[in-house]
């Protein structure tokens, strides 16, 4: 069996997605997500100019050897562009292999470890009242876990909170927009938000919060301590992820569970965090960390230290990644939770899929492969549109972490 064709499909049904399609000489094909939010074209070039020419003629069943070839053979290892491109190849090959076996991907991975997959969604509001209403709507849809983000008084725009659309999309401008940030206003207000949410909805719903890398370690420790009475499921991305020892200091000061990893692209990015048990959940994504092959290694390593998975699952990842992640979630023993932001009807039409949602939980479906396809004719109707992520400045003008 040989790979005879591979192509990159770029489409924008409401936001940009990059998809790799690999075709074999038996007519079986697989697809993988290659979307890197705000840097999509860089992955397209990496695939088309460097990886696809080498991929043609290889046996698609040799997934591990192909992965090692592109990782070790690149010399310039790791990095978001290269690992996203490698992930697209890896997921497409797993899709092919499962189709060859005529079984859903989770069966090929080892079979299911649970009957359904717990997910969380986002509840965002420009103020406290609208945030409480967003939580109520999410709860009414059946979600048992909800990430809560709220506008901060005195800050014009806050991460996670939409200002002009129903669905929050941070990559919203042709060139990076500038947002203003105040750490002190944020730290003074957010504990009150969670106090109000707990008072309104009680102790039984799981609550999560994303800091989005905005704090120093001691500031994050302060926030984690202040949130302890409200028993969060996790506090996410509390500090910039480059210095893993930052989490050691946070851990020393608070029992609020910690999650990190959506910007990671290698097991080496999270090795110290996991083995020192400085985090509780690893959020590394299949699409940005080299695919299923490396995520298996990360999850297996994490299981040795009681760290569970909590994959990133916002709409900056296509339904292709969501489908692959759900099959992984179904199988992985140390599963924690799966993020879910609903794709639009437009997006779902371009990417028909077998996975389903019911009462706060997902199942990946029984279709062979990862169960997600792409309608190429429909995808062609939505051309690429450049969209950049914002940048942050403090109130005095200092550039800050977005």
UniProtKB/Swiss-Prot annotation:
Q: Which reaction does it catalyse?
A: D-mannonate = 2-dehydro-3-deoxy-D-gluconate + H2O
Q: What is its EC number?
A: 4.2.1.-, 4.2.1.8
InterPro entries, from UniProt?
A: D-mannonate_dehydratase-like, D-mannonate_dehydratase_GalD, DgoD-like, Enolase-like_C_sf, Enolase-like_N, Enolase_C-like, Mandel_Rmase/mucon_lact_enz_CS, Mandelate_racemase_C
SUPFAM superfamilies per record: Enolase C-terminal domain-like, Enolase N-terminal domain-like
Residues annotated as binding substrate: 37, 122, 262, 283, 312, 316, 339
GO function terms (MF aspect): magnesium ion binding; mannonate dehydratase activity
Instruction: Return one Gene Ontology term, BP aspect.
Output: carbohydrate catabolic process
Q: Which residues form the active site?
A: 159 (proton donor/acceptor), 212 (proton donor/acceptor)
Domain of life of the source = Bacteria
| Cofactor(s) needed | Mg(2+)
The keyword Metal-binding belongs to this UniProt entry's keyword annotation = yes
- Leading EC class: lyase
> What does the entry list as the binding residues for Mg(2+)?
210, 236, 262
The UniProt keywords, alphabetically, are:
Lyase, Magnesium, Metal-binding
Note on cofactor: Binds 1 Mg(2+) ion per subunit.
Q: Which family does it belong to?
A: Belongs to the mandelate racemase/muconate lactonizing enzyme family. GalD subfamily.
Task performed by this protein: Has low D-mannonate dehydratase activity (in vitro), suggesting that this is not a physiological substrate and that it has no significant role in D-mannonate degradation in vivo. Has no detectable activity with a panel of 70 other acid sugars (in vitro).
Protein name, entry field: D-galactonate dehydratase family member RspA
């Amino acid at each position: 069996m040989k790979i005879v064709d591979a192509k990159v499909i770029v489409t924008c049904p409401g936001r940009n997605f990059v998809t790799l399609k690999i075709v074999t000489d038996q007519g079986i094909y697989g697809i993988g997500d290659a979307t890197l939010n705000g840097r999509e074209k860089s992955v397209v070039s990496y695939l088309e100019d460097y990886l696809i020419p080498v991929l043609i003629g290889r046996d698609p069943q040799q997934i591990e050897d192909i992965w090692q070839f592109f990782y070790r053979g690149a010399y310039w290892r790791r990095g978001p562009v290269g690992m996203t491109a490698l992930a697209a190849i890896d997921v497409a090959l797993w899709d092919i292999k499962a189709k060859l076996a005529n079984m859903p991907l989770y069966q090929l991975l080892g079979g299911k470890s649970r009957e359904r997959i717990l997910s969380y969604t986002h509840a965002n509001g420009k103020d406290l009242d609208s945030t409480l209403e967003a939580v109520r709507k999410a709860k009414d849809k059946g979600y048992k876990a909800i990430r809560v983000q709220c506008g901060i008084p005195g800050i014009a725009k806050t991460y996670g909170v939409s200002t002009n659309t129903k669905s929050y999309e941070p990559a919203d401008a042709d060139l990076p927009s500038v947002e203003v940030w105040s750490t002190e206003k944020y730290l003074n207000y957010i504990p009150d938000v969670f106090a109000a949410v707990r008072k309104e909805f009680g102790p039984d719903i799981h609550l999560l919060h994303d800091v989005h890398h905005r704090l120093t370690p001691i500031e994050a420790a302060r926030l984690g301590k202040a949130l302890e009475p409200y028993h969060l499921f996790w506090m996410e991305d509390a500090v910039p992820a480059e210095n893993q020892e930052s989490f050691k200091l946070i851990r020393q000061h608070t029992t609020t569970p910690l999650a990190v990893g959506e910007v990671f692209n290698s097991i080496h990015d999270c090795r110290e965090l996991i083995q020192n048990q400085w985090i509780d959940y690893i959020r590394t994504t299949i699409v940005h960390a080299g695919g299923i092959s490396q995520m298996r290694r990360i999850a297996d390593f994490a299981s040795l230290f009681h760290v569970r998975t909590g994959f990133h699952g916002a709409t900056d990842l296509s339904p292709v990644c969501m489908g692959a992640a759900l099959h992984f979630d179904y199988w992985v023993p140390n599963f924690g939770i799966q993020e879910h932001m609903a794709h639009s009807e437009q997006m779902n039409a371009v990417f028909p899929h077998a996975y389903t949602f019911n009462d706060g939980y997902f199942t990946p479906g029984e279709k062979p492969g990862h169960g997600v396809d792409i309608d190429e004719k429909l995808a062609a109707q939505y051309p690429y549109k450049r969209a950049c992520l914002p940048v942050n400045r403090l109130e005095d003008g200092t550039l800050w972490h977005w």
